[in-house]
Amino acid sequence: MDKLVNCFYGRPDALTRLFCFPWAGGGSLFYARWGGFFDESVEVCSIRLPGRESRSSEPFTQSMDQIIDEVITVLLPQLQGKSFVFFGHSFGAFTSFATAVRLKEKYGLEPAHLFVSGASAPHAKFLHSSIKKSELNDGEFLKWVTSVGGTPAEILGNKEALQLFLPPLKADVIVFDNFVRSFDKPASPPLSCSLTCFDGTEDIPHDLAAWQELTSGDFNIHKMPGGHFYLKDPKNEKSLVTYISKYLETTERNL
């Protein structure tokens, strides 16, 4: 399905497609594995943004619009005849949400469910008033990355590894900073799909409740033990996949 999408377990006859959007600086491999965790009724498609993995020679995206445009151009034919859902963690929560909004506004299409993780709603007040992480100097930026967690020590302690790791991360953080500061809460919810927020209990506080203002559909919050990258813990990852699977089973019975 194009260089944008990594699908380890292609299932053309699946009833539902789960599209997973990467965290800042992330690639597609973590989510592509999920295809092996779901049954034959679900096809997992992991988004691969420019500047990483097989797209490492391509320039990074410069704006949220650029990401949305590419995702929709590639995915639109796959979205028009089959149920689909979105999942996004951290930066991926914003890219998946923004893509869902554009799909509904321009094409009348909407995911059956939006799963967002590890992120405040884009109109959360403190996001608009906090210091832009993309404007931190290299030392401060690395200190912030370390505080968030999730980055292996062998990368943080290796200068050459950091030279490969930090550029895509910083590029995504620039997109994030510009997106949240230009986002104004709409007068009415832009989405009508169900929305679930996942979060780690030890992560920094997120304004999860504000996500409810962005959809007229069902809304719930589900927390798991751990910090910002709680989903990298095998037990949490299993719980996350189980939660999504149960929702998809219910959706498929109603198709």
Task: Give residue ranges: language-model regions.
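Domain-scale detector for complete catalytic domains at protein termini or as standalone homologs
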Residues: 1-87, 94-255
